[in-house]
Amino acid sequence: YAADAAYLVDRCDSNEYLENLSNIFRKEAIDFYIPGTDVELIFCAVNKQLIKDKFSVHTIISSIEVITFSNNKYKTASFLRENGLNYPRTDYLKDIDIEGIEYPVIVKPSVGCRSIGVYKINNLEELTPHLENTKDIVIQECVGNEDEEYTCTVVKIGDELSPVLALKRVL
């Protein structure tokens, strides 16, 4: 990645995080802030008005409700299905017929980030340990390959939508 500057900041659950942002906002004369990681989204949505009032910086971020909804893989897949959009087949692990699974599949928490608890499963033997605790675990059709990841962003300000930015990241 290319950037004019880079900063190491404390975790967003740290008391120092907002102070870290404040220093960057002042030093770099920031007008708009777009949080870059899943873990800071809720913090930034909650503190959006504070950041604007205290630092005159506009945080470009969805509402807490949208973030909470979209963090849930099952709800997101259901929304995509209901709106005629493509999505990987997604079910709660507790609700599926184990014998009918077409491998490989992805097993992961319904709500999570940073690939924590995400497993590519190639057969029943690999799936078996995950069957012990199926609470809030989803199973998804495996798309792409393990060397790449897809992400998509749309920004809405008022009634205006930006073009869709779809990225394929090579891991």
Q: Where does each model-flagged region fall?
A:
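Short loop/helix-cap segments at secondary-structure boundaries that form the rim of catalytic
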Residues: 1-3, 97-101, 129-133
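ATP-binding N-terminal substructure of ATP-dependent carboxylate-amine bond-forming enzymes
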Residues: 1-60
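Short acidic-hydrophobic, aromatic-tinged amphipathic segments that line or gate anion-handling sites
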Residues: 6-12, 89-94, 119-122
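Glycine-/Pro-rich loop/turn segments that contact NAD(P) or position catalytic residues
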Residues: 64-93
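ATP-grasp fold ATP-binding core
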Residues: 80, 90, 101-116, 135-146, ...
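Phosphate-binding site of ATP-dependent enzymes
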Residues: 122-171
